[in-house]
């Protein structure tokens, strides 16, 4: 007798082994029709998988997050089915699930075109309409090799070669004549795959290495139903309008070019925006007791070997040589801050000591991963490090938490999730040290009275970290600030203080950043605000425009008055109609446009308009200054 325990605690008995689908059928025809997969004793399995022992079972449908992920994975296989029917000569590589979608990498002698993508999507719809069952067969490894060898799928064979010899059998999933291998689970029938859309094609490299052959990557998205798909498409259309690259070009903020992949050319208005963010964060440093420092861009590799970066991070580092010495361009600022700390003798009474730096770092990101200013190779962090006693961790983390929330609120973010990234597989130190570090973060967040989610395996190699995930105006989540506890690096780099017993001890090192990469944060700000920044943040806060040449001198005097008050202001004295000027600066998302005609000139006033088209009427220059000052960030 097989006893199956359901999520509500009820039990069902079966005389012999039973499949997930059969259990669903015993509950009701409606549930059976909706069943995508099952979760047996916490493990996701196919609907066709048989349960041969007493177990707990949760039926997975499209209403579950796991169900939507399975739909996406099955859609990737459906891409393979359609592609092989249309282009039988191509070679299939791999098709994983990603956030809100999936992709499939394919080797093709020629690049796919938009017409190809349309044809593939059409064929997928035709295959879905056939309403066929997806068949799973657990197959011995040798037979799997034979299956793909007969089909000439050399990349599948390479993937099998990389698998552990302990794997003696694999799941093959058959979409009619098409077969793919996968851990699964997958949908039992193509009727679950109707709400999908292919989104784009890009290039990729085999194993992510530019030295290897180039592949074609077909991206798509899939959802539980058409309503969810349509909502996603609307979100993506809005995201496209907000694309920081589009707005950056339209507002003349920055550009990127082929000769400097992953590096940003900042234009005057973009650099003005940067400076507003940097000066705001510099004030945060000062108010929080951080001494600002500046450390070298390149350091001898011996220092990176001591810090642990050489063993754990060298693939992402740039190197250079001079006079038979090898140097690394810094990917992180922490070892430099330890060198500053090490230049003096410190007592336990001196701690905590806090350093902050707008530190320029470089990381050798794969070219395919670069994305505007959101993913770059050269970036600047609002990086800070606190050297403290173990007893001070809680108060320092608590203070940082409050500080970070205040910054995010000032920049317009109020939906914030907090997560703790725990020890990764590849790490420094022993489990006892990690236990202590992770407990310290949990304790500090507990004192703050906040809820958090834990992320096993996602901490840095030298310590666990708190992560701040911010939701933007269109519901996307961005990971920004971090606070990391590090018991390892101070010892590796010789950081010491003298304790109350005159003994030398290693301090705890806290790594913290609030906005993280300045480039990325500015890209997020652009998209969050759709280029319509709050007046305190806008690259140009005010434009003063004349109606005729008769007001030119007065316009310039107004500009100077505002500039002398520290506002970012420009004058538009072009020989253009005022309606044209208003439209142009409105499109540039300038917060305020001050229009000056003869009446305003005579009265020492300005006519104030907002970028939303609101007419605020005529006011004195001093009254407008008071209004603008009231809108500045604290």
Curated annotation (Swiss-Prot):
This is Threonine--tRNA ligase. It is found in: Cytoplasm. GO terms for cellular component: cytosol. Residues 1-61 form the TGS domain. Catalyzes the attachment of threonine to tRNA(Thr) in a two-step reaction: L-threonine is first activated by ATP to form Thr-AMP and then transferred to the acceptor end of tRNA(Thr). Also edits incorrectly charged L-seryl-tRNA(Thr). Residues 243-534 are annotated as: Catalytic. One of its GO terms (biological process) is threonyl-tRNA aminoacylation. Its EC number is 6.1.1.3. Homodimer. It holds the Pfam family tRNA_SAD. Its cofactor is Zn(2+). Binds 1 zinc ion per subunit. InterPro entries: aa-tRNA-synt_IIb (IPR002314), aa-tRNA-synth_II (IPR006195), aa-tRNA-synth_II/BPL/LPL (IPR045864), Anticodon-bd (IPR004154), Anticodon-bd_dom_sf (IPR036621), Beta-grasp_dom_sf (IPR012675), TGS (IPR004095), TGS-like (IPR012676). It comes from Xanthomonas euvesicatoria pv. vesicatoria (strain 85-10). Zn(2+) binds at residues 334, 385, 511. Transmembrane segments: none annotated. It catalyses: tRNA(Thr) + L-threonine + ATP = L-threonyl-tRNA(Thr) + AMP + diphosphate + H(+). One of its GO terms (molecular function) is ATP binding. Keywords: Aminoacyl-tRNA synthetase, ATP-binding, Cytoplasm, Ligase, Metal-binding, Nucleotide-binding, Protein biosynthesis, RNA-binding, tRNA-binding, Zinc. Its main location: cytoplasm. It is an enzyme of class 6 (ligase). The gene is thrS. Belongs to the class-II aminoacyl-tRNA synthetase family.
């Amino acid at each position: 007798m097989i006893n199956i325990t359901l999520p509500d605690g009820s039990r069902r008995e079966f005389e012999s082994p039973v499949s997930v689908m059969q259990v669903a059928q015993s509950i009701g025809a409606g549930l059976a029709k909706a069943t995508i997969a099952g979760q047996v004793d916490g493990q996701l399995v196919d609907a066709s998988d048989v349960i041969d022992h007493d177990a707990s079972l949760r039926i997975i449908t499209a209403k579950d997050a796991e169900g939507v992920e399975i739909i996406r994975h099955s859609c990737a296989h459906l891409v393979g089915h359609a592609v092989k029917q249309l282009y039988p000569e191509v070679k299939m590589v791999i098709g994983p699930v990603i956030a809100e979608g999936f992709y499939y990498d394919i080797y093709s002698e020629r690049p796919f075109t938009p017409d190809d993508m349309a044809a593939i999507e059409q064929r997928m719809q035709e295959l879905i309409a056939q309403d066929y069952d997806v068949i799973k067969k657990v197959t011995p490894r040798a037979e799997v090799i034979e299956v793909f060898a007969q089909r000439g799928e050399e990349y599948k064979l390479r993937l099998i070669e990389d698998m552990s010899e302990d794997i003696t059998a694999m799941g093959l999933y058959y979409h009619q004549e098409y077969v793919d291998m996968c851990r699964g689970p997958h949908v039992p029938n193509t009727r679950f795959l109707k709400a999908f859309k292919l989104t784009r094609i890009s290039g990729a490299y085999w194993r992510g290495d530019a030295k290897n052959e180039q592949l074609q990557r077909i991206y798509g998205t899939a959802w539980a139903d058409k309503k969810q798909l349509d909502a996603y498409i609307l979100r993506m259309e809005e995201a496209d309008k907000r694309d920081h690259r589009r707005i950056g070009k339209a507002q003349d903020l920055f550009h990127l070019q082929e000769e400097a992949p992953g590096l940003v050319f900042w234009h005057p208005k973009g650099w003005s925006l940067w400076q507003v963010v940097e000066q705001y964060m510099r004030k945060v440093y000062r108010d929080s007791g951080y001494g600002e420092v500046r450390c070298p861009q390149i350091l001898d590799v011996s220092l990176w070997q001591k810090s642990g970066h050489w063993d754990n991070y060298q693939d992402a580092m740039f190197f250079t040589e001079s006079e038979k010495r090898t140097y690394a361009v810094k990917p992180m600022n922490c070892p430099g801050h330890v060198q500053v700390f090490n230049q003096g003798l410190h007592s336990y009474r001196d701690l905590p000591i806090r350093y902050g730096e707008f530190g320029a770092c470089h990381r050798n990101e794969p070219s395919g991963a670069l994305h505007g200013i959101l993913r770059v190779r050269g970036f600047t962090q609002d990086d800070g490090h606190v050297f403290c006693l173990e007893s001070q961790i809680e108060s320092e983390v608590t203070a940082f938490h409050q500080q970070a929330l205040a910054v995010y609120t000032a920049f317009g973010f109020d939906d914030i999730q907090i997560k703790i990234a725990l020890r990764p597989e590849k790490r420094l130190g022993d489990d006892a040290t990690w236990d202590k570090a992770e407990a310290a973060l949990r304790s500090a967040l507990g004192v703050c009275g906040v809820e958090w989610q834990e992320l096993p395996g996602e901490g840095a190699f030298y310590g666990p970290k708190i992560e701040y995930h911010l939701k933007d105006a269109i519901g996307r989540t961005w990971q920004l600030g971090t606070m990391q506890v590090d018991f390892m690096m101070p010892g590796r780099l010789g950081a010491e203080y003298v304790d109350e017993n005159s003994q030398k001890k290693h301090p705890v090192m806290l790594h913290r950043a609030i906005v993280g990469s300045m480039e990325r944060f500015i890209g997020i700000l652009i998209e969050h605000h759709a280029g319509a920044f709050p007046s305190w943040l806008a690259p140009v806060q005010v434009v003063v425009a004349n109606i005729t040449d008769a007001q030119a001198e007065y316009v310039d005097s107004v500009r100077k008055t505002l500039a002398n008050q520290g506002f970012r202001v420009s004058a538009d004295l072009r020989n253009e109609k005022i309606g044209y000027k208003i439209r142009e600066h409105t499109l540039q998302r300038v917060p305020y446009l001050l229009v000056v005609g003869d009446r305003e000139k005579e009265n020492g006033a300005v006519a104030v308009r907002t970028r939303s088209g609101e007419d605020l009427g005529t006011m004195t220059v001093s009254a407008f200054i008071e209004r603008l000052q009231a809108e500045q960030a604290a």
